[in-house]
Amino acid sequence: MALAKESSIVVSSSPDVTHNITRPVASYHPNVWGDRFLLSSSDQVQLTMKARDDKVVVDELKKEVRRKLKEASNDYIRLLQTVDVIQRLGLAYHFEEEIDQALRYLFETFHDYSEDSQDMYANSLSFRLLRQHGYRISCEIFEKFKDANGGFKIPNIEGVMGMLEFYEATHLRVRGEDILDHGFVFSRNYLKSVLPSLSNPLAAQVDRALNQNSNRRGLPRLEARHFMSVYEQYASHDQALLKLAKLNFNILQSLHKVELSEISRWWKGVDIARNFPYARDRIVELYFWVLGVYFEPQYAVGRKITTKVIAIASLLDDTFDAYGTFEELRIFAEAVERWSVSCLDQLPEYMKLLYKTMLEVSDEIEEEMTKLGTPFRIAYGIEAIKTFARSYFLEAKWREEKYKPTTEEYMGLATKTCGYKSLIITSFLAMGDIPKREHFDWVLSDPDFVMASCIICRLADDIVGHEFEQTRDHIPSSVECYTQEHKTSKEDAVNELYDRLESAWKDLNEGFLRPTKIPAALLYRVLNYCRIIEVMYSRGDWYTHVGPEMQGFVRQLLVDPVPE
């Protein structure tokens, strides 16, 4: 979308005095969904009742799957494959205890199995599953698959599944694992070369891994839906597992539709088109974002709170980035620090509703935390909202001063303005009794794990979105900073930033490995924030520009049920 310099009559630093102010307004396209996600009361009741009926069948199928897990408990390969399929179908949260027990067994017996095994598929799958769950498995197990020239042995066509699993396993690598760095390049090139000769369902799996996302980086709900369509094509598929996956997916979709309807009604009350016409109207995409962070039914309150907070963050971003004058932003930033309804009279008219909405959402956080019996979390939630405005104002200062930061200076601020630290804290708020005070303080201490997520968010956004941003008055992105600092081409800058992004993924993988003092449930929130970035910013800024592919993802999760 092209940008336009628009002359707007707005309130300046005093709400009683208006001036003609020329503003650089980004011409964002309107909401593509209209009111389609606003459900009537009868629609909500119908969805809820069907989900309740289906849950009876689901509970019976879960018993059957537990029996199958028990039957496979002493068969290494069978157990390995059963756990993998359960996870790929999006069912792992139903069988956490059983999967933990299975993985302990696989870890304890892995060395003996791997020592005698030349099966690349089983070794790679073992490595991936165990590393995903924090077990420190050495990458040296792949040395036996190297050839005399230091490359990897090329399998016959029947061995493609082994190479695919090896490719998936390389996405769990950490810094210093050269064999997996080489293995990633080799397996990717090999799979690309054989893809045209493959037939479904294997071709669909290889294509997905190469052109969408790996198992590690894909969005669990999207990957589960895709895997169902692949899995049912294999003659060996387990009918009970497949039926359970489809029913479970649709039950969750019904729950999510009801949640999105309630959030959409709240957003309609804010009335973005009338009150904030300069901003991106993207509540559906924001709920999709948060759904990527956690989809399980027990986190419904968390999704509601986090969606509202990220919606406020988006409004703040557009206000600071593409509308407010520096003086208006200064006044607003000061009001945020004071955090009081008494500040409303000092704000420009168009900022009053935004400030009031921020206070209302913070009141809602306070109410929910009081219900949960965790009042200490209230301050963390409010501080998370304040941090958005604080960091956006620092960016506005750079823009006002025409400051040209170095790449490292830019990243120091940009890892704050990406908002991921605040969003991670927000997503912890309503996670029951899992997060303790020390876990919130851990996020605020900038550990490598959290900073890796901020780097992934910022660089992925910059790489695909910097050209659009630079068409208006905007601070340079990491691409421009690196290009100017190192006197290099944009292509070289982007390649360097991709390398940094990959290094951040390695740090993220390292943070999962045991021992760790942070509960896995919290670590997965951070990982899932990175996964949603991989989906929404891999080939463009699909939050700002909601094209057919992004709309298709939304439909898969929030419109079309899986055919049963």
Curated annotation (Swiss-Prot):
Keywords: Lyase, Magnesium, Metal-binding. Disulfide bonds: none annotated. Mg(2+) 3 binds at residues 461, 469. Its EC number is 4.2.3.133, 4.2.3.-. The Asp-Asp-Xaa-Xaa-Asp/Glu (DDXXD/E) motif is important for the catalytic activity, presumably through binding to Mg(2+). GO terms for molecular function: alpha-copaene synthase activity; magnesium ion binding; sesquiterpene synthase activity. It catalyses: (2E,6E)-farnesyl diphosphate = alpha-copaene + diphosphate; (2E,6E)-farnesyl diphosphate = delta-cadinene + diphosphate. Pathway: Secondary metabolite biosynthesis; terpenoid biosynthesis. A motif (DDXXD motif) lies at residues 317-321. Binds 3 Mg(2+) ions per subunit. Belongs to the terpene synthase family. Sesquiterpene synthase converting farnesyl diphosphate to alpha copaene and delta-cadinene as the major products. Mg(2+) 2 binds at residues 317, 321. PANTHER family: (-)-GERMACRENE D SYNTHASE, OS04G0344100 PROTEIN-RELATED. This is Bifunctional sesquiterpene synthase 1. The keyword Heme does not apply. It comes from the Eukaryota. The keyword Iron does not apply. It comes from Phyla dulcis. Mg(2+) 1 binds at residues 317, 321. One of its GO terms (biological process) is diterpenoid biosynthetic process. Its cofactor is Mg(2+).
